[in-house]
From Swiss-Prot:
Pfam families reported for this sequence: Ribosomal_S2
Primary location: plastid
Keyword Plastid: yes
PANTHER family linked: 30S RIBOSOMAL PROTEIN S2 PROKARYOTIC AND ORGANELLAR (PTHR12534), SMALL RIBOSOMAL SUBUNIT PROTEIN US2M (PTHR12534:SF0)
Subcellular location field: Plastid, Chloroplast
SUPFAM superfamilies (alphabetical): Ribosomal protein S2
GO BP of this protein: translation
GO CC annotations, alphabetized: chloroplast; mitochondrial small ribosomal subunit
A single MF term (Gene Ontology): structural constituent of ribosome
UniProt name for this protein: Small ribosomal subunit protein uS2c
UniProt record similarity statement: Belongs to the universal ribosomal protein uS2 family.
Source organism per UniProt: Eucalyptus globulus subsp. globulus
Keyword entries, A-Z: Chloroplast, Plastid, Ribonucleoprotein, Ribosomal protein
Length: 236
Protein backbone atom coordinates (compact mmCIF):
# COMPACT_ATOMS: atom_id res chain seq x y z
CA UNK A 1 0.00 0.00 0.00
CA UNK A 2 1.50 3.31 -1.14
CA UNK A 3 1.81 6.05 1.48
CA UNK A 4 0.51 9.44 0.37
CA UNK A 5 0.31 12.95 1.77
CA UNK A 6 -3.18 13.84 3.02
CA UNK A 7 -2.63 17.38 4.38
CA UNK A 8 -3.43 16.37 7.96
CA UNK A 9 -2.74 19.49 9.98
CA UNK A 10 -2.28 19.39 13.78
CA UNK A 11 -3.41 23.00 14.18
CA UNK A 12 -6.58 22.31 12.21
CA UNK A 13 -7.27 19.30 14.44
CA UNK A 14 -6.77 21.40 17.59
CA UNK A 15 -9.22 24.01 16.31
CA UNK A 16 -11.79 21.25 15.76
CA UNK A 17 -11.25 19.93 19.30
CA UNK A 18 -10.07 16.53 18.08
CA UNK A 19 -7.72 16.29 21.07
CA UNK A 20 -10.36 16.57 23.81
CA UNK A 21 -11.10 13.20 25.41
CA UNK A 22 -13.50 12.10 28.12
CA UNK A 23 -13.23 12.78 31.84
CA UNK A 24 -10.31 10.98 33.46
CA UNK A 25 -12.69 8.74 35.42
CA UNK A 26 -14.24 7.37 32.22
CA UNK A 27 -11.08 6.29 30.46
CA UNK A 28 -10.06 2.86 29.18
CA UNK A 29 -6.49 2.06 30.36
CA UNK A 30 -5.77 0.54 26.94
CA UNK A 31 -5.92 4.08 25.57
CA UNK A 32 -2.88 5.13 27.65
CA UNK A 33 -0.45 5.06 24.66
CA UNK A 34 -2.70 7.53 22.81
CA UNK A 35 -3.11 10.05 25.65
CA UNK A 36 -0.61 12.89 26.02
CA UNK A 37 -1.89 14.73 29.12
CA UNK A 38 -4.64 15.40 31.65
CA UNK A 39 -6.18 18.86 31.73
CA UNK A 40 -8.99 20.10 34.00
CA UNK A 41 -10.21 16.58 34.66
CA UNK A 42 -10.18 15.35 31.06
CA UNK A 43 -7.69 13.36 29.02
CA UNK A 44 -5.97 14.97 26.04
CA UNK A 45 -5.36 12.81 22.99
CA UNK A 46 -1.91 12.78 21.37
CA UNK A 47 -2.66 14.42 18.01
CA UNK A 48 0.59 13.18 16.47
CA UNK A 49 -0.76 9.64 16.85
CA UNK A 50 -4.17 10.74 15.59
CA UNK A 51 -2.48 12.14 12.46
CA UNK A 52 -0.49 8.94 11.96
CA UNK A 53 -3.50 6.61 12.15
CA UNK A 54 -5.73 8.95 10.14
CA UNK A 55 -3.07 8.99 7.43
CA UNK A 56 -2.92 5.17 7.48
CA UNK A 57 -6.71 5.04 7.19
CA UNK A 58 -6.66 7.47 4.25
CA UNK A 59 -4.06 5.29 2.50
CA UNK A 60 -6.24 2.22 3.08
CA UNK A 61 -9.47 3.74 1.76
CA UNK A 62 -7.70 5.34 -1.22
CA UNK A 63 -6.23 1.97 -2.15
CA UNK A 64 -9.59 0.21 -1.70
CA UNK A 65 -11.52 2.87 -3.64
CA UNK A 66 -8.99 2.74 -6.48
CA UNK A 67 -9.89 -0.96 -6.81
CA UNK A 68 -13.64 -0.33 -6.84
CA UNK A 69 -14.34 -1.48 -3.29
CA UNK A 70 -17.54 -0.56 -1.43
CA UNK A 71 -17.71 1.36 1.87
CA UNK A 72 -20.27 1.63 4.66
CA UNK A 73 -20.16 4.56 7.11
CA UNK A 74 -21.91 4.07 10.45
CA UNK A 75 -22.77 6.80 12.96
CA UNK A 76 -26.22 6.90 14.52
CA UNK A 77 -25.98 9.36 17.41
CA UNK A 78 -27.49 12.80 16.86
CA UNK A 79 -24.15 14.61 16.78
CA UNK A 80 -22.83 12.33 14.03
CA UNK A 81 -25.91 11.56 11.94
CA UNK A 82 -25.89 14.60 9.65
CA UNK A 83 -22.11 14.53 9.07
CA UNK A 84 -22.27 10.79 8.28
CA UNK A 85 -25.00 11.26 5.66
CA UNK A 86 -23.25 14.23 4.02
CA UNK A 87 -19.87 12.47 3.91
CA UNK A 88 -21.32 9.24 2.54
CA UNK A 89 -23.36 10.95 -0.17
CA UNK A 90 -20.33 13.00 -1.23
CA UNK A 91 -18.18 9.88 -1.63
CA UNK A 92 -20.98 7.63 -2.97
CA UNK A 93 -20.74 5.36 0.08
CA UNK A 94 -23.51 3.47 1.85
CA UNK A 95 -24.40 4.70 5.33
CA UNK A 96 -26.43 4.02 8.47
CA UNK A 97 -27.17 7.13 10.53
CA UNK A 98 -30.45 6.48 12.36
CA UNK A 99 -30.39 3.10 14.07
CA UNK A 100 -28.31 -0.04 13.59
CA UNK A 101 -30.73 -2.93 13.18
CA UNK A 102 -29.17 -5.98 14.85
CA UNK A 103 -28.05 -8.53 12.24
CA UNK A 104 -27.91 -5.94 9.46
CA UNK A 105 -24.70 -7.57 8.21
CA UNK A 106 -24.53 -10.96 9.96
CA UNK A 107 -28.09 -11.75 8.84
CA UNK A 108 -27.63 -10.29 5.38
CA UNK A 109 -30.37 -12.41 3.75
CA UNK A 110 -32.99 -10.74 5.98
CA UNK A 111 -31.57 -7.29 5.23
CA UNK A 112 -31.64 -8.11 1.52
CA UNK A 113 -35.31 -9.11 1.76
CA UNK A 114 -36.10 -5.79 3.48
CA UNK A 115 -34.19 -3.91 0.78
CA UNK A 116 -36.15 -5.67 -1.98
CA UNK A 117 -39.39 -4.71 -0.20
CA UNK A 118 -38.13 -1.12 0.12
CA UNK A 119 -37.24 -0.89 -3.57
CA UNK A 120 -40.60 -2.39 -4.61
CA UNK A 121 -42.55 0.09 -2.47
CA UNK A 122 -40.52 3.02 -3.82
CA UNK A 123 -41.25 1.87 -7.38
CA UNK A 124 -44.97 1.55 -6.58
CA UNK A 125 -45.03 5.01 -5.02
CA UNK A 126 -43.18 6.65 -7.92
CA UNK A 127 -45.60 5.04 -10.39
CA UNK A 128 -48.53 6.42 -8.35
CA UNK A 129 -49.94 2.96 -7.74
CA UNK A 130 -50.16 3.36 -3.94
CA UNK A 131 -52.71 6.16 -4.39
CA UNK A 132 -55.00 3.83 -6.32
CA UNK A 133 -55.31 1.44 -3.38
CA UNK A 134 -58.00 1.67 -0.68
CA UNK A 135 -57.07 4.44 1.79
CA UNK A 136 -56.31 2.07 4.67
CA UNK A 137 -54.03 -0.17 2.55
CA UNK A 138 -52.27 2.84 1.03
CA UNK A 139 -51.69 4.39 4.49
CA UNK A 140 -50.23 1.12 5.82
CA UNK A 141 -47.83 0.75 2.89
CA UNK A 142 -46.78 4.41 3.14
CA UNK A 143 -45.98 3.90 6.83
CA UNK A 144 -43.91 0.84 5.89
CA UNK A 145 -42.10 2.84 3.23
CA UNK A 146 -41.38 5.68 5.67
CA UNK A 147 -40.00 3.21 8.24
CA UNK A 148 -37.78 1.51 5.64
CA UNK A 149 -36.57 4.90 4.35
CA UNK A 150 -35.57 5.93 7.87
CA UNK A 151 -33.56 2.82 8.68
CA UNK A 152 -32.44 1.51 5.28
CA UNK A 153 -32.41 4.67 3.14
CA UNK A 154 -28.63 4.96 3.37
CA UNK A 155 -28.05 1.40 2.15
CA UNK A 156 -30.78 1.20 -0.48
CA UNK A 157 -28.25 0.59 -3.26
CA UNK A 158 -26.17 -1.94 -1.31
CA UNK A 159 -26.20 -5.30 -3.10
CA UNK A 160 -23.81 -7.22 -0.83
CA UNK A 161 -21.64 -6.91 2.25
CA UNK A 162 -19.34 -3.85 2.29
CA UNK A 163 -15.58 -4.23 1.83
CA UNK A 164 -14.68 -1.67 4.54
CA UNK A 165 -16.79 -0.20 7.35
CA UNK A 166 -16.03 3.22 8.89
CA UNK A 167 -17.45 3.61 12.41
CA UNK A 168 -17.80 7.00 14.10
CA UNK A 169 -18.30 5.98 17.75
CA UNK A 170 -17.05 2.60 18.95
CA UNK A 171 -19.24 2.42 22.04
CA UNK A 172 -22.40 3.68 20.34
CA UNK A 173 -21.92 1.34 17.35
CA UNK A 174 -20.55 -1.66 19.25
CA UNK A 175 -23.10 -4.05 17.69
CA UNK A 176 -22.06 -2.97 14.18
CA UNK A 177 -18.39 -3.39 15.08
CA UNK A 178 -18.97 -6.90 16.49
CA UNK A 179 -20.81 -7.90 13.30
CA UNK A 180 -17.85 -6.71 11.21
CA UNK A 181 -15.41 -8.63 13.42
CA UNK A 182 -17.57 -11.78 13.11
CA UNK A 183 -17.63 -11.48 9.30
CA UNK A 184 -13.98 -10.43 8.94
CA UNK A 185 -14.88 -7.08 7.38
CA UNK A 186 -12.04 -4.53 7.87
CA UNK A 187 -13.00 -1.60 10.09
CA UNK A 188 -11.80 1.96 10.64
CA UNK A 189 -13.05 3.37 13.93
CA UNK A 190 -12.94 6.74 15.69
CA UNK A 191 -12.00 5.98 19.28
CA UNK A 192 -12.28 8.36 22.21
CA UNK A 193 -10.39 7.90 25.48
CA UNK A 194 -13.07 5.54 26.84
CA UNK A 195 -12.71 3.02 23.97
CA UNK A 196 -10.72 -0.15 23.25
CA UNK A 197 -8.11 0.57 20.54
CA UNK A 198 -7.56 -3.12 19.79
CA UNK A 199 -10.99 -3.93 18.29
CA UNK A 200 -10.84 -2.17 14.90
CA UNK A 201 -8.30 -2.77 12.13
CA UNK A 202 -7.37 0.92 12.21
CA UNK A 203 -8.35 2.93 15.29
CA UNK A 204 -8.15 6.73 15.02
CA UNK A 205 -7.89 8.35 18.47
CA UNK A 206 -10.16 11.40 18.33
CA UNK A 207 -12.97 13.25 20.04
CA UNK A 208 -16.12 11.38 18.98
CA UNK A 209 -18.52 13.84 20.67
CA UNK A 210 -17.73 17.16 18.95
CA UNK A 211 -19.39 17.69 15.57
CA UNK A 212 -16.35 19.60 14.27
CA UNK A 213 -14.03 16.72 15.20
CA UNK A 214 -16.27 14.07 13.60
CA UNK A 215 -16.65 16.18 10.47
CA UNK A 216 -12.90 16.77 10.11
CA UNK A 217 -12.04 13.07 10.37
CA UNK A 218 -14.82 12.07 7.96
CA UNK A 219 -13.84 14.80 5.49
CA UNK A 220 -10.25 13.50 5.33
CA UNK A 221 -11.43 9.91 4.78
CA UNK A 222 -14.02 10.94 2.20
CA UNK A 223 -11.47 13.03 0.28
CA UNK A 224 -9.19 9.95 0.11
CA UNK A 225 -12.10 7.78 -1.07
CA UNK A 226 -13.02 10.31 -3.79
CA UNK A 227 -9.38 10.48 -4.94
CA UNK A 228 -9.27 6.69 -5.07
CA UNK A 229 -12.51 6.52 -7.04
CA UNK A 230 -11.13 9.03 -9.56
CA UNK A 231 -8.08 6.82 -9.98
CA UNK A 232 -10.36 3.78 -10.51
CA UNK A 233 -12.40 5.61 -13.17
CA UNK A 234 -9.24 6.67 -15.02
CA UNK A 235 -7.65 3.21 -14.82
CA UNK A 236 -10.47 0.63 -14.62
Amino acid sequence: MTRRYWNINLEEMMEAGVHFGHGTRKWNPRMAPYISAKRKGIHITNLTKTARFLSEACDLVFDAASRGKQFLIVGTKNKAADSVARAAIRARCHYVNKKWLGGMLTNWSTTETRLHKFRDLRTEQKAGRLNRLPKRDAAMLKRQLSHLQTYLGGIKYMTGLPDIVIIVDQQEEYTALRECITLGIPTICLIDTNCDPDLADISIPANDDAIASIRLILNKLVFAICEGRSSYIRNP
